[in-house]
Amino acid sequence: MKVSATDSQNVTAGFILKDREENILVEKSLQLNKENNHLEGTICVDLESVRLWDNHNPYLYHAYVELKAEDGSLAEVIPYDIGFRRIEIIDKVVYLNGKRLVITGVNRHEWNARTGRCIGIEDMKADISCMLRNNINSVRTCHYPDQIPWYYMCDDAGIYVMAETNLESHGSFQKLGAIEPSCNVPGSIPQWRDAVLERAKNNFETFKNHTSILFWSLGNESYAGDDIEAMNVYFAEKKDGRLVHYESAYYNRAYEDTISDFETRMYAKPEDVEEYLNNSPKKPYILCEFMHDMGNSMGGLGSYMKLIDKYDMYHGGFIWDFIDQAIMVKDPVTGKDVLRYGGDFDDKPADYEFSANGIVFADRKEKPAMQEVRYYYGLYR
């Protein structure tokens, strides 16, 4: 544990670790000496045994960090629940706590049908409950950091998090469906580097203590260049035991060895996944987006899930997406609540129902597609 503080006097840092029954397992202290008005120190503890955190048993310990003034008076206490888990790649296969990791995930936008992107605690609780009920064990925070309480809920519930950095520049390298990166940003443009690194730093520093975060994602659909490579270096240098994810290096193979711990695709066909895994694969494989659930979709989920049993290096993926983005309004004729999408407000141009890709409606009622999700994801609980 590292303690960093700013104070005008020398202080003592204390660390207390308790189990759920409030039994004290560790109690240590460290004198922090002032240097240039900055206090810093590291407390190391050894535990003979711990209960490991995962989706099946999200066991959290109660940690307390204390700061005491020179006279012994208590200046500050920070309580924080922490878990113990290890994620690693061995022989190109990802393991969590020594067991092969299988992702049964979803991409999740923050959405409420009445308040838009301003969601509340009850929305988050409903989403956690829905995920657990339907065998969803992972969430990608597409394509930006979520509200802070969400990460605490994932810690408590055992939901694995791919914490995505707030970055997407889709239109700068894909034009009319074709890959054309001549105007790509951030690319390798020096003026953009500090901006994207600041976003990576914001993501890391805000959420670095959350047990549920297994992966840092560098962003979404922004091609690949020196700037995103620098983001990868930033997270790798933190050596926090997490893995780094980024999809769009697929389009620029010059960076395949320096960006992302995964081979990761979106909407690759099952045979495309197999083609990679059958031809000297370099990295473990996940689908950061698959099963685009627009309309009466989700029928092909089983063909992807079979790959989990066939290839150890295939680790599953994240369905696109969790919840429709639609707005609840009163129907002018019937007076009833109805959900409306792009184009329903005489807005042109519009993407029409393209915001309706969820496995739940915008009012959080489950769609029929959820039955398919519950069944196939349940096979890998």
Language-model features and meaning:
Residues I148, H170-S172, Y223-G225, N252-A254, ...:
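Generic structural signal for helix capping and beta-alpha/helix-loop junctions
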Residues M1-M153, A157-V161, R199-A200, L214-F215, ...:
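Secreted/periplasmic carbohydrate-active enzymes, especially glycoside hydrolases
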Residues Y144, N166, G219-Y223, D240, ...:
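Catalytic metal-binding/acid-base residues of hydrolase active sites
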